[in-house]
Amino acid sequence: MSKIVKVLGREIIDSRGNPTVEAEVHLEGGFVGMAAAPSGASTGSREALELRDGDKSRFLGKGVLKAVEAVNGPIAKALLGQDAKDQANIDKIMIDLDGTENKSNFGANAILAVSLANAKAAAAAKGMPLYEHISDLNGTHGQYSMPLPMMNIINGGEHADNNVDIQEFMIQPVGAPTLKEAVRMGSEIFHHLAKVLKAKGMNTAVGDEGGYAPNLESNAAALAAIKEAVEAAGYVLGKDVTLAMDCAASEFYNNETGNYELKGEGKTFTSQEFTHYLEELTKQYLIVSIEDGLNESDWDGFAYQTKVLGDKIQLVGDDLFVTNTKILKEGIDKGIANSILIKFNQIGSLTETLAAIKMAKDAGYTAIISHRSGETEDATIADLAVGTAAGQIKTGSMSRSDRVAKYNQLIRIEEALGSKAPFNGLKEVKGQA
């Protein structure tokens, strides 16, 4: 009953108004899975390739008809008659057929959309929720947890049209007893932050990930505004709520000078100086997690940063590791960072994503399931976070349906699983248990 009878791809629109790939996988018995590939703005140079058409007469060159053709042509032909329950085989067929290291023939956007749609179809055929099927694929049947959200309530960098260099300023409602209560706390703080910003005469328009995107005098000013909002909402920073940042430092790294240039503050730092700049912010604002605190190729700098901060806070590799087990293994061997951000379109298939999560956990690293800045209503990452018991999720702010869709799916899953999926709060963050 799980034999593939049809694979269909189409071009749809993501949350930035750009095209992306959506795929359907149809099985015997009428079971169907549908999924869409997300898209990043600040991307690691070693990510799997997102195939775009380059035809300037359509979508300013960002069309994905070539990727869709790959789904409807060679991928569909190769998968017809295959068993959808054998996810590893489905992904291997597509990867082998593509034949490139970075999936540049078909595009990671094509392969991933089919990979996820296949998992959804297989779950339907098994008569179970997607998170349960993912738990089976992960070899951890029935081992669930609800993830601690990282809520990006001030957007900067490549995600916003403002003068703030650091890309994401996030809250983590660590004191909540449940995921649903964590969402409530995040929502309250989000609305109080709007009041704080308006009182300062600042803009409350939102960026790509649903957080506010005001012009600010410094990165510290963003943290100070959030601290004020946390307290206005009746919560205690460091007890009820902790802070996290995604620097996306590759975006303000000067390749010629080797320095980090915070243009919003008019400051320039060497690699070690920037680590100490971050160290001061962590002390002042009780930050427990920093992502991509240096340029993705600054491995010596990351080794130093891990030495200085790695036993105190979570140091997350995103552009650094790009959900790639080869790169992650090198990082683990060299003692670089202590956590990995998991974005399945960086690697391009569900099987490879699960392998990266397993490698991280086996090495004592945390794994944070993440959206991309270009999203759709597809909420697969919610099921992925629960089904792998990853422990943390990063899926934007408390506005924009492309972000809220994931929180709403998590609320539904928590309701269904109850005590089978505990919410562990701060214990999930590396160095904070």
Swiss-Prot record:
Chemical reaction(s) catalysed: (2R)-2-phosphoglycerate = phosphoenolpyruvate + H2O
Instruction: Tell me which GO cellular component terms the UniProt record holds.
Output: cell surface; extracellular region; phosphopyruvate hydratase complex
Tell me the residues on which N6-acetyllysine occurs: K326
- Which pathway or pathways does this protein act in? Carbohydrate degradation; glycolysis; pyruvate from D-glyceraldehyde 3-phosphate: step 4/5
From the UniProt record, give one GO term of the biological process aspect: glycolytic process
Q: How is it modified after translation?
A: Acetylated and 2-hydroxyisobutyrylated at Lys-326 and Lys-343, respectively, reducing the enolase activity. Deacetylated and de-2-hydroxyisobutyrylated by NpdA/CobB, increasing the enolase activity.
Per UniProt, the enzyme's principal EC class comes to lyase
Which SUPFAM superfamilies does the record associate with it?
Answer: Enolase C-terminal domain-like, Enolase N-terminal domain-like
Q: What is its EC number?
A: 4.2.1.11
Q: How is the cofactor bound?
A: Binds a second Mg(2+) ion via substrate during catalysis.
Is Signal one of the keywords?
no
Positions that bind Mg(2+) = D246, E291, D318
Q: Which cofactor does it need?
A: Mg(2+)
Q: What is its main location?
A: cytoplasm
**Which residues are catalytic?**
E209, K343
Q: Which UniProt keywords apply?
A: Acetylation, Cytoplasm, Glycolysis, Hydroxylation, Lyase, Magnesium, Metal-binding, Secreted
Compartment list: Cytoplasm; Secreted; Cell surface
Q: Where (2R)-2-phosphoglycerate is bound, by residue?
A: Q167, K343, R372, S373, K394
Q: Report the residues modified as N6-(2-hydroxyisobutyryl)lysine.
A: K343
Molecular functions (GO terms): magnesium ion binding; phosphopyruvate hydratase activity
PANTHER family tied to this protein: ENOLASE
Q: What does this protein do?
A: Catalyzes the reversible conversion of 2-phosphoglycerate (2-PG) into phosphoenolpyruvate (PEP). It is essential for the degradation of carbohydrates via glycolysis.
Record-stated family: Belongs to the enolase family.
How is this protein named in the record?
Answer: Enolase
